[in-house]
C-alpha cells in the first residue's frame, strides 16, 4: 500500500514538472457577449436584464449591490425578482422599487472559473424643478428687440433622470416646432423674429420614462419693434449667459452664440486651441451657432464667437466644449503560469473622459477584499503572494459616468510541492482551471449581436417614429428587423408585432460605421404609455430582441397647428445607385416650426411599402438617398416634422438613377489565330435574343439540308429500279422450263433428259415455231414478265396432268414462265392432238387450257425445274457450252 502511494505521488510530481509555461491570451475563449444595460424606470415598472456568454456555462448567478452594501448573490425566491436561464442566456426580471435600486451584474461559472459581466445600474425616474417658484424669479425676462434678430431664451434648470423633453408655449398655445437642446436646460430658439413674434412664452419639461410633466414658472415677454431704432452694437439680453457645453463622442453638438443688435449681427467663429475645428467636413456654421457632427475627443476645447454688425465694439463669446468618452481598455492584462507563493504584477490600461476608474475581480471577487492583492495606481494589480484561490479568471474593469468596459485573462497557479512522510515526492491536489473551458467549440460564427434599444418620437396621434442602430460587429448578418410594442395601460397586455419586415439594406464600404435605421408604428392610441423593442432576424433564421425602450407617453396633438408641407423641386441623378432630392418651403419663416424632414421612396413599378429616411435640420434643402438600383425610376415624397407632430405629405415626384454605362470603344480586328487555351474562369455571354436567332437559323438550315438529301436519295432509288428491270428479266430467264426455249434466243446448249428419247426431235420443232412468233410477242411478253413478277400471285400447276407422279415446289417466277411456255406451245401446235410428245407439256390431259383456273388450282404433282448457277452475263451463259441445268 505504501509502495502504491509512493508511485502515485511520484507520477503527479513528474506530470507537474512537465507542465510548460504558457502565455495567457487576452481572449481565453469564454467571455460575456452581452452584458446587462443600465435602465431608468418609474416605481412599479418591471425591467429585464439580459446576460449572454460565448459558451454555455455550468450555471449562472446574479449579484446585486445597493448604495449602502457590497455585492451579494441573489436568490430567485424573492418576490421582486425572477431569474430564468436558457442555455447560454440568463435573464433577471426586477420590479422597480426603492429596495431594488442599485447595481446588477451576472456571473457565469465554467468549472472553477467565474466570468463576470459589466455593471448595470437601475435608477428611479425623477423630475424636479429645484427650489419652487422662488428659484425662478430671476428668469422672468422682458426683452425688446428689432425685427430680424435671433432670440435664444433659456427656460430654466431642472433635475430629471433621464433627460427631459421640452415643450414651449406662445400665448398659452403650444409651439410644435420648438428647437430644444439635449441637456437639462431647455433653450427656445426664435430665428429672424418679426412683429408677429411678440408675445408671452413659457416652457414645460416632460420626463420621458415616467411621462410626468413639470411646468416651469419662468416666462419671457418679447416685444419686436418694426419701427427703426437707434443703431446699437451687439449685446446680450438680460438672462442670457455663456456656458460650458458638455457632449459625448459620436454625438452632434450645437454651440449657440446669443446676442442682438441693430442691425442684426452676424457670427464669426474661431478656436485657438483646436486646430482645424472650424473648417472641416463635420462642422457647419449656422446663423445662430456652430454645429459639429460626429463629435471626436480632439474637438474638445475653447471656441470663440464674435458678433459683429459694423458698430463697435463687437461682442465676444468664449464657450468651453467638454467632450466625454466612454471607457475603453486598450491594454488587457496577461498572466503566465505562476508558482504558488510567488509575487505577480498585472497591468491594465484604459482610456476615457473623464478618466476611468480601474478595479479588479478575481473569480468574481473584488481584489480590494483580498489580503494578498494590492491594487495600485495606473491600473496595476500586485499579488504579493499568489495563492491557489487566485487560480481562475482575472478581470480588469474600467468605469466612468458614461459606462464600463472589461478585459480578462486566465491565471494558472502551480502548487507548492511537499515531501510525503515516506520520503517520496508528492504535491497538493491541483485542478487546472481551464479543464472545463477547452474541448468545446468557441461560439464565434453563431454570435448574434442585437440592435440597440429604439429611440421613440411622436409622429401623430396614432403613430410614432422609432430610431435604432447596429454597432460594427463580426457576428451573424442581419436579414431584417421586426418592431414590437406593448401598451402599459391595463393588465395582461402582451407584445404586439408589426407586419412590416424592415430590411437591413445593402452592405456598404464603410464597414466600421454605425448603421442607423428608422421605422414608424401606426395604430396606436393617444394618451397611453407604450414600450417598444426591435427584433432582429439573422442569417441562420434565428432572432434576438433588443433592450426595451423607456416608457413613452403618446400625447394627443389635435389642437396643434398644421406644419408647412415641403415642395419637391427637383430630383438629381447623382449616380447609378443614388439621387439627390431638392425641395423648398413656401416661406422661410416656416423653418421656425420644423425640426426636420422624413423622405419616403419606392420604385414606381412597385406597390409595396415606402422606404424611409430621416433628415435632421429645418434649414436642409437637399438630401442624398443611396443604395438604389441602377437605371430605375423611383417615386418620392417628403414630410416635415417637429417634436410633437408631422405635416401632410408633399406631392409625389418621380426620379431616375443613372443607367449603367455601356462601353462604346471599338476593339481592332485581330487576324492572327489565338492559340492560347482559355481559362476555366472565362465565360462567353450572348444576348438571349441573338442566341435564339442563331439557334433557330441553324435548325432551319439543318431541316433544308435533310430534305434535299431525302429527295436525292428518292430520285436515285427510282433510277436504280429502272436499270434493274432488264436484270430482273434476265434472272427470270435463268429458270428454263423443260422442252421450251428462250423468248429471245434458242437455248441449244441445255441438255434435257426426258422419259421418251424420241421427244427431242419434237422439242426442236417446237422451238423453231416459237422463234417465228418471238418478235410478235416480245413487247407484250416483256410487259407481262414485269407485271407478273411484281403483281401476280404464285401459280400452282397440276403435276399429274403434266405427266409427273411426284410433287415439287417451284418458285413463283418459274411457274409463271412455264405457264406462258404452255400457252405458246398450244398456239404453235394447233390443237390438242397435233403433238406427239409423250410429255404432254403443251396441253393438259383433261382438255383444259393453260390459263384455266382449274389448271392453276390443281394439287397434282408438277414438273421440277433446277436453277442453274448464275454467270456474269446472259450472253456468257448461252455461249459457255456447259450444262447449266437438268430438267427431269
Swiss-Prot record:
Cystine pairings recorded for this chain: 51-106, 155-203, 257-305, 348-396
Signal peptide residues on this chain, from the entry's feature table: 1-24
Membrane topology listed for this record: Single-pass type I membrane protein
The gene coding this protein: iHog
InterPro entries: Cell_Adh-Cytoskel_Orgn, FN3_dom, FN3_sf, Ig-like_dom, Ig-like_dom_sf, Ig-like_fold, Ig_sub, Ig_sub2
Localization, UniProt: Membrane
Protein name: Interference hedgehog
Record's compositionally biased regions (Polar residues): 655-667, 843-859
Spans through the membrane: 689-709
Subunit architecture: Homodimer. Heterotetramer; 2 iHog chains bind 2 hh chains when facilitated by heparin, heparin is required to promote high-affinity interactions between hh and iHog.
Domain (Fibronectin type-III) ranges: 450-557, 565-660
The entry's keywords: Disulfide bond, Glycoprotein, Heparin-binding, Immunoglobulin domain, Membrane, Proteoglycan, Repeat, Signal, Transmembrane, Transmembrane helix
PANTHER family, per database record: CONTACTIN 5, IG-LIKE DOMAIN-CONTAINING PROTEIN
Amino acid at each position: 500500500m505504501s509502495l502504491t502511494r509512493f508511485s502515485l505521488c511520484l507520477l503527479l510530481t513528474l506530470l507537474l514538472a512537465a507542465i510548460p509555461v504558457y502565455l495567457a491570451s487576452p481572449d481565453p475563449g469564454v467571455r460575456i457577449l452581452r452584458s446587462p444595460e443600465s435602465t431608468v424606470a418609474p416605481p412599479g415598472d418591471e425591467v429585464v436584464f439580459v446576460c449572454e456568454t460565448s459558451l454555455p456555462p455550468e450555471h449562472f448567478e446574479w449579484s446585486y449591490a445597493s448604495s449602502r452594501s457590497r455585492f451579494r448573490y441573489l436568490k430567485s425566491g424573492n418576490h421582486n425578482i425572477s431569474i430564468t436561464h436558457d442555455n447560454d442566456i440568463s435573464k433577471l426580471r426586477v420590479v422597480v422599487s426603492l429596495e431594488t435600486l442599485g447595481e446588477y451584474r451576472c456571473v457565469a461559472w465554467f468549472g472553477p472559473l467565474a466570468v463576470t459581466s459589466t455593471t448595470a445600474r437601475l435608477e428611479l425616474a425623477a423630475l424636479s424643478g429645484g427650489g419652487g417658484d422662488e428659484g425662478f424669479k430671476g428668469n422672468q425676462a422682458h426683452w425688446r428687440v428689432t425685427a430680424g434678430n435671433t432670440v435664444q431664451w433659456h427656460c430654466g434648470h431642472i433635475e430629471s433622470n433621464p433627460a427631459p423633453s421640452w415643450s414651449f408655449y406662445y400665448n398659452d398655445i403650444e409651439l410644435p416646432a420648438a428647437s430644444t437642446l439635449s441637456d437639462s436646460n431647455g433653450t427656445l430658439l426664435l430665428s429672424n423674429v418679426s412683429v408677429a413674434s411678440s408675445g408671452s412664452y413659457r416652457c414645460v419639461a416632460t420626463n420621458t420614462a415616467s411621462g410626468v410633466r413639470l411646468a416651469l414658472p419662468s416666462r419671457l415677454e418679447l416685444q419686436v419693434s418694426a419701427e427703426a431704432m437707434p443703431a446699437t452694437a451687439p449685446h446680450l439680453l438680460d438672462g442670457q449667459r455663456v456656458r460650458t457645453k458638455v457632449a459625448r463622442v459620436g454625438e452632434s453638438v450645437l454651440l449657440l452664440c446669443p446676442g442682438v443688435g441693430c442691425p442684426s449681427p452676424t457670427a464669426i467663429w474661431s478656436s485657438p486651441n483646436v486646430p482645424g475645428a472650424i473648417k472641416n467636413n463635420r462642422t457647419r456654421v449656422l446663423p445662430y451657432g456652430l454645429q459639429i457632427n460626429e463629435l471626436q475627443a480632439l474637438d474638445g476645447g475653447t471656441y470663440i464667437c464674435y458678433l459683429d454688425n459694423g458698430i463697435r465694439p463687437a461682442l465676444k463669446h468664449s464657450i468651453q466644449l467638454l467632450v466625454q468618452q466612454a471607457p475603453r481598455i486598450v491594454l488587457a492584462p496577461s498572466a503566465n503560469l505562476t508558482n504558488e507563493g510567488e509575487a505577480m504584477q498585472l497591468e491594465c490600461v484604459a482610456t476615457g473622459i473623464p478618466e476611468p476608474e480601474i478595479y479588479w475581480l478575481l473569480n468574481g471577487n473584488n481584489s480590494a477584499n483580498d489580503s494578498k492583492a494590492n491594487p495600485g495606481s495606473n491600473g496595476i494589480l500586485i499579488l504579493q503572494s499568489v495563492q491557489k484561490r487566485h487560480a481562475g479568471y482575472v478581470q480588469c474593469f474600467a468605469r466612468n459616468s458614461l459606462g464600463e468596459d472589461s478585459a480578462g485573462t486566465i491565471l494558472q497557479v502551480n502548487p507548492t510541492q511537499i515531501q510525503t512522510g515516506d520520503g517520496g515526492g508528492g504535491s497538493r491536489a491541483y485542478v487546472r482551471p481551464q479543464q472545463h473551458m477547452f474541448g468545446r467549440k468557441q461560439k464565434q460564427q453563431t454570435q448574434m449581436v442585437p440592435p440597440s434599444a429604439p429611440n421613440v418620437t411622436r409622429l401623430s396621434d396614432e403613430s410614432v417614429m422609432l430610431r435604432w442602430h447596429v454597432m460594427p460587429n463580426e457576428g451573424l448578418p442581419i436579414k431584417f428587423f421586426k418592431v414590437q410594442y406593448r401598451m402599459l395601460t391595463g393588465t395582461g397586455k402582451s407584445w404586439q408585432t408589426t407586419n412590416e419586415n424592415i430590411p437591413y439594406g445593402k452592405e456598404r464600404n464603410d464597414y466600421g460605421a454605425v448603421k442607423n435605421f428608422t421605422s414608424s408604428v401606426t395604430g396606436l392610441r393617444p394618451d397611453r404609455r407604450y414600450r417598444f423593442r426591435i427584433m432582429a432576424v439573422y442569417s441562420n433564421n434565428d432572432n434576438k430582441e433588443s433592450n426595451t425602450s423607456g416608457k413613452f407617453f403618446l400625447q394627443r396633438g389635435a389642437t396643434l397647428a398644421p406644419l408647412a408641407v415641403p415642395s419637391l423641386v427637383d430630383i438629381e441623378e447623382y449616380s447609378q445607385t443614388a439621387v439627390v432630392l431638392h425641395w423648398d418651403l413656401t416661406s422661410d419663416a416656416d423653418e421656425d416650426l420644423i425640426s426636420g424632414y422624413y423622405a419616403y421612396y419606392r420604385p414606381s413599378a412597385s406597390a409595396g411599402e415606402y422606404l424611409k429616411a430621416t433628415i435632421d435640420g429645418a434649414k436642409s434643402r437637399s438630401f442624398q438617398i443611396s443604395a438604389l438600383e441602377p437605371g430605375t425610376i423611383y417615386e418620392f415624397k417628403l414630410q416635415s416634422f417637429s417634436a410633437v407632430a408631422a405635416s401632410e405629405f408633399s406631392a409625389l415626384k418621380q426620379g431616375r438613377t443613372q443607367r449603367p454605362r455601356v462601353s462604346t470603344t471599338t476593339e481592332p480586328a485581330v487576324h492572327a489565330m489565338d492559340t492560347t487555351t482559355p481559362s476555366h474562369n472565362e465565360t462567353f455571354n450572348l444576348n438571349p435574343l441573338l442566341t435564339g436567332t442563331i439557334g433557330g437559323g441553324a435548325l432551319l438550315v439543318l431541316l433544308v439540308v435533310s430534305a434535299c438529301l431525302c429527295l436525292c436519295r428518292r430520285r436515285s432509288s427510282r433510277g436504280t429500279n429502272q436499270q434493274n428491270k432488264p436484270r430482273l428479266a434476265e434472272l427470270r430467264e435463268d429458270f428454263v422450263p423443260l422442252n421450251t426455249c428462250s423468248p429471245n434466243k434458242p437455248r441449244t446448249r441445255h441438255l434435257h433428259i426426258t422419259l421418251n428419247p424420241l421427244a427431242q426431235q419434237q422439242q426442236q420443232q417446237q422451238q423453231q415455231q416459237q422463234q417465228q412468233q418471238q418478235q410478235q410477242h416480245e413487247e407484250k411478253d416483256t410487259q407481262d414478265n414485269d407485271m407478273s413478277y411484281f403483281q401476280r400471285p404464285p401459280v400452282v400447276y397440276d403435276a399429274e396432268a403434266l405427266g409427273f407422279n411426284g410433287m415439287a415446289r417451284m418458285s413463283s417466277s418459274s411457274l409463271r414462265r412455264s405457264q406462258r411456255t404452255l400457252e405458246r406451245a398450244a398456239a404453235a401446235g394447233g390443237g390438242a392432238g397435233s403433238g406427239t410428245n409423250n410429255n404432254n407439256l403443251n396441253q393438259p390431259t383433261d382438255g383444259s387450257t393453260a390459263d384455266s383456273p382449274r389448271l392453276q388450282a390443281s394439287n397434282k404433282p408438277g414438273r421440277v425445274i433446277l436453277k442453274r448457277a448464275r454467270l456474269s452475263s446472259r450472253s456468257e451463259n448461252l455461249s459457255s457450252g456447259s450444262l447449266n441445268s437438268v430438267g427431269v
